[in-house]
Swiss-Prot record:
Family the entry assigns: Belongs to the eukaryotic ribosomal protein eS1 family.
Organism: Coccidioides immitis (strain RS) (Valley fever fungus)
UniProt keyword Acetylation present: yes
Gene encoding the protein: RPS1
InterPro entries: Ribosomal_eS1, Ribosomal_eS1_CS, Ribosomal_eS1_euk
Keywords, comma-separated and alphabetical: Acetylation, Cytoplasm, Ribonucleoprotein, Ribosomal protein
The protein's name: Small ribosomal subunit protein eS1
Length: 255
C-alpha cells in the first residue's frame, strides 16, 4: 500500500503569503519631446525605473531610440509611409529632449513601388553636414513611360542607369553637404527627390524618386546649447543684465 500525505490534514501555514508588488509602482513616466522642426512636439510617454541609489533614471533614458511616423509628427497623412527615429540626448525634469537619428520607409510602401516592366535605380551617398554629422542617404528611383511611347516596357540601358546614378549622387552630395542636419531633415521628404527627377529628365524620365533611408553614422560631441536651441528652449540673451540700484551703506548698531 502506498503511503502518501493526507491533504485533508493540514499542519498549518508555515508563513504568510508574500505580498505581490506592482512593478509599475516603482516606475515614473517621462514625456518624449520632438525637435521644433516638426509640427507636433509631444511624441508620447516612456516609463523608467525610479532613481534608487547609484542607478539614475536619467542615465537609463539617455540613448533610447523611438520610432515615430512622420504623418503623426507633421499632421499630414501623405507622409504615413516614412518612419522617423528620434534619440534621447538630454533629460530635463520630466521631459526627454530628442534629436534626429534616422529615417526609413515602411516595408509595404517599398514593396508597392516595385513593379514589372520598369528599371529600378538605387544609389547611396555618405555625406558630412555643416554641423559635423556623418550621414548615409539611400535614394531609389524608377523609370516611367514617355508621353509618346507605345512600347509597354520602360527598361533603361546600362549607360543610362549609370548616368542617372551619377546625377543622383551629385545632387545628394550638393544638397546635404551644404546644410545642417536640421535643414537636411526638411529636405529629405520631398525636395531632393524632385530635384533628381528634374535633373534626369533628359536622360530618362523617372517616377517615385525618394530618399528611402537616412542612416546616422557619426555625430559630433554633445552640445547642450545646440540641443536646447533645437527645442526652442535656449535663452536669446546669455549675458546677465545690469541692475541699477543705489548703494546704501549699512551702519552697525553694536560692535
Amino acid at each position: 500500500m502506498a503511503v502518501g500525505k493526507n491533504k485533508r490534514l493540514s499542519k498549518g501555514k508555515k508563513g504568510l503569503k508574500k505580498r505581490v508588488q506592482d512593478p509599475f509602482s516603482r516606475k515614473d513616466e517621462y514625456l518624449v519631446k520632438a525637435p521644433s522642426t516638426f509640427a507636433v512636439r509631444d511624441v508620447g510617454k516612456t516609463i523608467v525605473n525610479r532613481t534608487t541609489g547609484l542607478k539614475n533614471a536619467n542615465d537609463s533614458l539617455k540613448g533610447r531610440i523611438f520610432e515615430v511616423s512622420l504623418a503623426d509628427l507633421q499632421n499630414d497623412q501623405a507622409h504615413s509611409f516614412r518612419k522617423i527615429k528620434l534619440r534621447v540626448d538630454e533629460v530635463q525634469g520630466k521631459n526627454c529632449l530628442t534629436n534626429f537619428h534616422g529615417m526609413d520607409f515602411t516595408s509595404d510602401k517599398l514593396r508597392s513601388l516595385v513593379r514589372k516592366w520598369q528599371s529600378l535605380i538605387e544609389a547611396n551617398v555618405t555625406v558630412k553636414t555643416t554641423d559635423d554629422y556623418l550621414v548615409r542617404l539611400f535614394a531609389i528611383a524608377f523609370t516611367k513611360r514617355r508621353s509618346f511611347q507605345v512600347k509597354k516596357t520602360t527598361y533603361a540601358r546600362s549607360s543610362q542607369i549609370r548616368a542617372i546614378r551619377k546625377k543622383m549622387v551629385e545632387i545628394i552630395q550638393r544638397e546635404a553637404s551644404s546644410r545642417t542636419l536640421t535643414q537636411l531633415t526638411k529636405l529629405v521628404p520631398e525636395v531632393i527627390g524632385r530635384e533628381i527627377e528634374k535633373a534626369t529628365r533628359g536622360i530618362y524620365p523617372l517616377q517615385n524618386v525618394h530618399i528611402r533611408k537616412v542612416k546616422l553614422l557619426k555625430q559630433p560631441k554633445f552640445d547642450l546649447g545646440g540641443l536646447l536651441a533645437l527645442h526652442g528652449e535656449a535663452s536669446t540673451d546669455d549675458k546677465g543684465q545690469k541692475v541699477e540700484r543705489e548703494f546704501t551703506e549699512q551702519v552697525l548698531e553694536s560692535v
